[in-house]
UniProtKB/Swiss-Prot annotation:
Keywords: Glycosidase, Hydrolase. One of its GO terms (cellular component) is cytosol. This is Non-specific ribonucleoside hydrolase RihC. It comes from Salmonella paratyphi A (strain AKU_12601). It comes from the Bacteria.
Length: 304
């Protein structure tokens, strides 16, 4: 199968990010041209180290650029309490000498976009700081973005505050800028990612697949967003799943705004599904997913 969709992946590994990176690398429908890192689950130094370790594990020469170390206006609030102090607790990766590109992430993204023969798809599975910086410094790049597929937000409950999902809440100003930018957005928020649960039985079959399955199984054993006894939610992997198998998802066009001022609500995505605000739709929000586990089994089988 010939890869038909050229993508750039912005990520903050992160245990479930490791699964998403595997899918982005090995799904035959995708051509991953650049990985960029951002501070989120842990510091950007750690997310960069983790991403480089994964690329070394898979013997991949995909270029990687390090991105923003802090949100646009706020101090970083990370999720080491979920992913462990390193961000990927549970597996001992082999040392390597690889380094990130010299240019920062938002400039590296600009370079790839502007040299591409046609608009490309951006996939963001961490805070949106790098994407906002790209659009702030190089607004002309918007014409070279086919769409942005992101994991973030929620029409209901949050997972970081009562109302806010982690990726949006870490840098709400960046998210607000991105949603106002006019680029096409597909939002895979908690409404759909909480449905993307891998069962204990599924997880325990991973080691028999390949080296990647063994590595992911070891990481999931240390993931504090679920457990091997109750199942694990694959939040970030949903964004890759939509790229490869959009027919598995139900989408709703809607207007999405990001609250940046509220004492208790900063980082909340205000999702106007019923059009009460009278604003034009600026996103397609994923509401439901069906057949997710089967697709995950298929895509992980492509990995070494």
């Amino acid at each position: 199968m010939t890869a038909s969709l050229h993508i750039i992946l912005d990520t903050d590994p992160g245990i479930d990010d490791a699964a998403a990176i595997a899918a982005a690398l090995f799904a035959p429908q995708l051509d991953l041209q650049l990985i960029t890192t951002v501070a989120g689950n842990v510091s950007v130094e750690k997310t960069t180290r983790n991403a480089l370790q994964l690329l070394h594990f898979w013997n991949s020469d995909i270029p990687l650029a390090q991105g923003a170390a802090t949100p646009l206006l706020r101090p970083l609030r990370d999720a080491a309490y979920v992913h462990g102090e390193s961000g990927m607790e549970g597996y001992d990766f082999v040392d390597h000498q690889r380094q990130p590109l010299a240019k920062p992430a938002f400039i590296s993204i600009r370079d790839v976009l502007m040299n591409a023969p046609e608009p490309m798809t951006l996939v963001a599975i961490g805070p949106l700081t790098n994407i906002a910086l790209l659009l702030m410094h190089y607004p002309e790049c918007a014409c070279n973005i086919r769409r942005l597929v992101l994991m973030g937000g929620s029409a209901g409950r949050g997972n970081f505050t009562p109302n806010a999902e982690f990726n949006i809440a870490v840098d709400p100003e960046a998210a607000a800028h991105v949603f106002r930018s006019g680029i096409e957005i597909v939002m895979c928020g908690l409404d759909v990612t909480n449905q993307a649960m891998l069962s204990p039985d599924f997880l325990n079959k991973l080691p028999a697949l390949n080296r990647t399955g063994k590595m992911l199984h070891s990481l999931f054993n240390h993931y504090r967003s679920g457990s091997m006894r109750t199942g694990v939610r694959m939040h970030d992997l949903c964004a890759i799943a939509w790229l490869v198998r959009p027919e598995l998802f139900t989408l709703q066009s809607c207007f999405v705004a990001v609250e940046t001022q509220g004492e208790y609500t900063a980082g909340t995505t205000v999702v106007d599904i019923e059009g009460r605000l009278g604003q034009p739709a600026n996103a397609q929000m994923a509401l439901d997913v069906d057949g997710f586990r089967q697709w995950v089994a298929e895509v992980f089988a492509y990995a070494p």
